[in-house]
């Protein structure tokens, strides 16, 4: 916890510095996501179309920024960002998830990506996919890895539900 105003200023400055230093890497990841969307959708007319009109890419963009803030232990704001994107797109990506490069969401309504999900590189998700947790057993909270791991070069098609901490 932060004890005084000076400590708050120091923490805020450190988070801002870290975030600003990470912007080139975030941009590089997003450009690979744009390429994945453009390359993966034969209906895409241009990368500009993908950037300005694809809800899946919007959700990925918000996730990438929110995830960076989450990794910096910024409270509440990453979750607010992800919920805003969820409301705008129907795509729910928890900012704690770990998502590799060249990520493509096609027709993304109803996608859920849980907090401890790990997604490799070159992964494609279609509408209605859930990468979720199992319910707690006998009222006990589940700790640790609760969501699936998806390896590289995977495609998960419409309506699939993958639950628990296993690898696919």
Where are each of the predicted segments found?
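Terminal amphipathic alpha-helical/low-complexity segments used for targeting or macromolecular assembly
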Residues: 1-83
């Amino acid at each position: 916890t932060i004890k005084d105003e000076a400590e708050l200023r120091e923490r805020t400055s450190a988070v801002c510095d870290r975030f600003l230093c990470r912007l080139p890497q975030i941009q590089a990841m997003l450009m690979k996501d744009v390429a994945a969307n453009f390359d993966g959708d034969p209906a895409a007319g241009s990368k500009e179309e993908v950037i300005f009109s694809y809800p899946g890419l919007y959700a990925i963009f918000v996730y990438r920024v929110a995830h960076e803030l989450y990794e910096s232990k910024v409270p509440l704001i990453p979750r607010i960002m992800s919920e805003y994107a969820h409301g705008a797109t129907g795509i729910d990506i928890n900012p704690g998830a770990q998502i590799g490069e060249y990520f493509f969401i096609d027709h993304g309504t109803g996608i859920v990506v849980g907090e401890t999900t790990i997604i490799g590189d070159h992964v494609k998700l279609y509408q209605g996919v859930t990468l979720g947790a199992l319910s707690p057993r006998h009222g006990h909270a589940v700790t640790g890895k609760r969501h699936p791991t998806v390896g590289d070069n995977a495609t998960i098609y419409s309506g699939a539900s993958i639950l628990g901490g296993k690898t696919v």
